[in-house]
């Protein structure tokens, strides 16, 4: 199926492979992990908090469906869902967002998935710029976005906390897929509470 994007068309659904991951549309087998991703307090700490009970019930009961720009991150070796990634136009601009379950953070999966998805976007979409928004206190995410070539466009307040709106050109080169973006200066991954 071909879908119309803000600036053109792209085939959908699409599966994107990286060395360790498959970025794919969600399926019914992902429901439990998706609910956990939406309700886990560690995962949601910088994402506006865990969803409420009514939203959780709606997710449990609704068909997952295939929506343009929304994928799950699954391990290539066994298809275990470890997180999600989106590239959509909810704010009127192409926006990247990602979340991992706590036990999968700090292992390079966020960087790997972002590089793979941004590489796909540069080939398939006509957009020139992609944005990302991160809480200023989410130092790991801000550090990753900077390493991916994002720069701060502006600060803003959202969900009662300070955020950064970052942007990068889709036409600029991406870091090598094999390169590790993790450095000793990076904050440690979150721990289970």
Task: Give residue ranges: language-model regions.
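Glycine-rich acyl-CoA binding loop
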Residues: 109-111
């Amino acid at each position: 199926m071909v879908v119309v994007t803000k600036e053109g068309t792209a085939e959908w659904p699409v599966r994107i492979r990286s060395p360790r991951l498959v970025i794919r549309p969600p399926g019914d087998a992902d429901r439990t992990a998706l609910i956990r991703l939406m309700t886990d307090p560690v995962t949601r700490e910088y994402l506006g908090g865990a969803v409420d009970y009514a939203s959780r019930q709606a997710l449990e009961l609704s068909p997952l469906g295939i929506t343009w720009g929304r994928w799950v991150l699954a391990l290539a070796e066994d298809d275990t869902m470890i997180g999600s990634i989106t590239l959509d136009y909810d704010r009127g601009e192409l926006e990247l967002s990602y979340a991992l379950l706590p036990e999968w953070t700090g292992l390079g999966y966020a960087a790997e998935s972002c590089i793979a998805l941004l590489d796909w976007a540069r080939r398939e979409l006509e957009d020139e710029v992609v944005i990302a928004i991160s809480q200023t206190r989410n130092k790991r995410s801000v550090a990753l976005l900077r390493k991916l070539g994002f720069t701060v466009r502006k600060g803003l307040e959202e969900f009662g906390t300070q955020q950064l709106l970052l942007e990068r050109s889709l036409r600029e080169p991406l870091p090598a897929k094999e390169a590790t973006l993790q450095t000793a200066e990076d904050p440690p991954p979150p721990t289970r509470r």
